[in-house]
C-alpha cells in the first residue's frame, strides 16, 4: 500500500535503517481510531514486523448505546485486514477495574477530581499491554497512537511533546519511566493531525474520517453525572458564597470541580450582580460547595500547589530547587514555576503568576522546553 501524502511529508529511511528495523517486531495498540491505524502503516513503511493488538478494558453493561467497544474492534480488524497484519485481542477489564476504576471512584468519594486516562496509561497501556506484548508475543517494542515523541541521544531516552502542539499528549504519559519510553514507538507524534487523516484517506482506511474519542473511556457519550451516581451515593448539601451566605443547593460535591461555571444551578440571587458563579472550594467536612462571582475573583487563584505521588521520567528524585514550566490541566499553556523538593514523594510548586482552578486530584506535569520531566498528583492549592 502507498500513500502520496506519506511519501511527501515524512522523511525517507535509508535501506540500511529499514533492514535494521526488519529484524524488530512491534505490537501496535489498535484502538479502532485513525491515529493507531496510521501508526501501524508508518511502522510498516519503516520496515518493522508489525502486528496489532486490541485491548478490551471495560465490560459492556446494559447501556449498549454508549459502549463502542464492538464497533471499535470491527474498525481495528478492518484496518489490520487492509494493511495485511495480524490483530491480537486481549481482555484487560479485570486489571482496569482493579487498578484504574476503583481508584477513580475512591478519588471522587474523597472529593478530588482524578484523571483516569493518566492511570490507564500507567497501569494498562504501558504496563499490562507492554508486559503482554514482550513476554507473550515476543515484541521488541510496543507502539501507540499517542502524540508524543521519543528522543535517544547519548544513551539518554527522553519523552518529548508531540510535534502537533494542538494534539500533544505528553501530559497523560508523565508517569512513564525512561525504560518504558525506550520500549515504545510513537509514529504519529512526529507529524500533525491533518496529515494523519490525509494518510488514512490516501489508504482508504475506514477510520480516516472517524471522530476522535472524547471523555472518559468507560463512560463514553453518556452523562457523567448519570454514570457516577450508579456507583457512588450522592449527598446533597448547601451552596455558599465565600462569606458564608447560602445561595442554593448542590447535588453532591463529587459532581463539581474547581473552576466550574456551568451546571451549578444558581439563578439570579437578590442583592448580587449578574456575574457568573465559579466553584472555588469544596468543604468536605460540612458538605458545602463554595462559590464566588467573576472569573477574576481572587478566590479562584492559587500561588502554587503541593504535589505527591511523583513520577520523574528518569526516575531520579530532584534534590534541589528546579526552574521549569508546569501544566496543571490538559491543554493549558505552560506556566513558569519553581519546584521545591520537600522529600522524595512531595514537592512544593510556586507559580511565577497566580493560576486559576488548580484542582486536587488532577496532575501537575513539568517541562523543560520540549522535554517532559515527569509530574505528580495535586494534593492541595497554595493560596
UniProtKB/Swiss-Prot annotation:
<dbReference type="InterPro" id="IPR046885">
    <property type="entry name" value="MnmA-like_C"/>
</dbReference>
<feature type="binding site">
    <location>
        <position position="145"/>
    </location>
    <ligand>
        <name>ATP</name>
    </ligand>
</feature>
<dbReference type="GO" id="GO:0002143">
    <property type="term" value="P:tRNA wobble position uridine thiolation"/>
</dbReference>
<dbReference type="Pfam" id="PF20259">
    <property type="entry name" value="tRNA_Me_trans_M"/>
</dbReference>
<dbReference type="GO" id="GO:0103016">
    <property type="term" value="F:tRNA-uridine 2-sulfurtransferase activity"/>
</dbReference>
<feature type="region of interest" description="Interaction with tRNA">
    <location>
        <begin position="329"/>
        <end position="330"/>
    </location>
</feature>
<keyword id="KW-0067">ATP-binding</keyword>
<feature type="region of interest" description="Interaction with tRNA">
    <location>
        <begin position="167"/>
        <end position="169"/>
    </location>
</feature>
<keyword id="KW-0694">RNA-binding</keyword>
<keyword id="KW-1015">Disulfide bond</keyword>
<feature type="binding site">
    <location>
        <begin position="29"/>
        <end position="36"/>
    </location>
    <ligand>
        <name>ATP</name>
    </ligand>
</feature>
<dbReference type="InterPro" id="IPR014729">
    <property type="entry name" value="Rossmann-like_a/b/a_fold"/>
</dbReference>
<keyword id="KW-0820">tRNA-binding</keyword>
<feature type="active site" description="Cysteine persulfide intermediate">
    <location>
        <position position="217"/>
    </location>
</feature>
<keyword id="KW-0963">Cytoplasm</keyword>
<dbReference type="Pfam" id="PF03054">
    <property type="entry name" value="tRNA_Me_trans"/>
</dbReference>
<feature type="site" description="Interaction with tRNA">
    <location>
        <position position="146"/>
    </location>
</feature>
<dbReference type="InterPro" id="IPR004506">
    <property type="entry name" value="MnmA-like"/>
</dbReference>
<dbReference type="GO" id="GO:0005524">
    <property type="term" value="F:ATP binding"/>
</dbReference>
<feature type="binding site">
    <location>
        <position position="55"/>
    </location>
    <ligand>
        <name>ATP</name>
    </ligand>
</feature>
<dbReference type="Pfam" id="PF20258">
    <property type="entry name" value="tRNA_Me_trans_C"/>
</dbReference>
<dbReference type="InterPro" id="IPR046884">
    <property type="entry name" value="MnmA-like_central"/>
</dbReference>
<keyword id="KW-0808">Transferase</keyword>
<feature type="site" description="Interaction with tRNA">
    <location>
        <position position="362"/>
    </location>
</feature>
<feature type="disulfide bond" description="Alternate">
    <location>
        <begin position="120"/>
        <end position="217"/>
    </location>
</feature>
<keyword id="KW-0547">Nucleotide-binding</keyword>
<dbReference type="GO" id="GO:0005737">
    <property type="term" value="C:cytoplasm"/>
</dbReference>
<protein>
    <recommendedName>
        <fullName>tRNA-specific 2-thiouridylase MnmA</fullName>
        <ecNumber>2.8.1.13</ecNumber>
    </recommendedName>
</protein>
<dbReference type="InterPro" id="IPR023382">
    <property type="entry name" value="MnmA-like_central_sf"/>
</dbReference>
<keyword id="KW-0819">tRNA processing</keyword>
<comment type="function">
    <text>Catalyzes the 2-thiolation of uridine at the wobble position (U34) of tRNA, leading to the formation of s(2)U34.</text>
</comment>
<feature type="region of interest" description="Interaction with target base in tRNA">
    <location>
        <begin position="115"/>
        <end position="117"/>
    </location>
</feature>
<comment type="similarity">
    <text>Belongs to the MnmA/TRMU family.</text>
</comment>
<dbReference type="GO" id="GO:0000049">
    <property type="term" value="F:tRNA binding"/>
</dbReference>
<feature type="active site" description="Nucleophile">
    <location>
        <position position="120"/>
    </location>
</feature>
